[in-house]
């Protein structure tokens, strides 16, 4: 198998990450409120298997997406050239964001262990909130990742212009989701109406982005910076 084909398979890992993430979402259950934790013991006893499976699927999804990030970095840096500052920033921010997604599953996995059977309801609620906060904080580096991808895309046309603007929207959605900690029971909370509108933004970018990468790898010339876009796109990351 030649190098180009390997690179295309690496880009296709974005679809694999999405599939694992979708399977994890399908296992979602309505959790008891952490402000009234008395329902946690019964909930955890009844849903232990689903909770553990969901966490492991999310962990695998995040791990596969880290693999995709390596392919994304190579794709961007070939077009950006020079030091590849923004391509490296996108890669590093994405690794931090999805690393936090992996670590954020640890509290939920802990709740499925045998030692958690005798855990006080209040302690279970604290662990649940801890995992949730980790996942919310992860949106900050993910927003940086999307904005960096957007700037490279709009400067070099390595992705179509419309896909660059989708990256801007995905970054804005991630930034907004980070404000969920301000009102944990508000519309940005995990099961709030606004979160259902904002979380899919990254998927709306990922599917066409991975498709474009697969099609262009190995048969596109290195793009060049468009001076007329430089000033405007720099403003996106200020």
Task: Label each PLM-derived region with a short phrase.
Residues 1-238:
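Hydrophobic, aromatic-enriched alpha-helical segments typical of multi-pass transmembrane helices
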């Amino acid at each position: 198998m030649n190098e180009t084909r390997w690179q295309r398979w690496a880009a296709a890992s974005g679809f694999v990450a999405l599939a694992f993430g979708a399977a994890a979402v399908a296992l979602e259950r309505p959790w008891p409120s952490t402000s009234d934790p008395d329902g946690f013991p019964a909930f955890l006893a009844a849903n232990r298997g689903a909770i553990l499976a969901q966490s492991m699927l999310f962990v695998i999804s995040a791990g596969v997406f880290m693999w995709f990030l390596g392919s994304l970095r190579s794709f961007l840096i070939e077009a950006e050239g020079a030091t590849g500052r923004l391509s490296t920033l996108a890669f590093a921010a994405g690794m931090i964001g999805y690393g936090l997604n992996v670590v954020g599953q640890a509290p939920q996995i802990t709740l499925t262990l045998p030692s958690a059977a005798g855990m006080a309801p209040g302690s279970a609620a604290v662990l649940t909130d801890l995992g949730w906060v980790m996942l919310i904080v992860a949106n900050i580096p993910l927003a940086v990742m999307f904005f960096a991808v957007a700037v490279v895309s709009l400067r070099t046309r390595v992705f179509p212009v419309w896909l660059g603007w989708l990256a801007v929207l995905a970054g804005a959605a991630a930034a907004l989701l980070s404000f969920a900690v301000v009102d944990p029971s508000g519309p940005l909370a995990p099961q709030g109406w606004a979160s259902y509108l904002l979380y899919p933004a990254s998927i709306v970018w990922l599917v066409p982005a991975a498709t474009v990468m697969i099609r262009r790898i190995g048969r596109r010339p290195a793009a060049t910076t468009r001076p007329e876009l430089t000033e405007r796109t720099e403003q996106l990351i200020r």
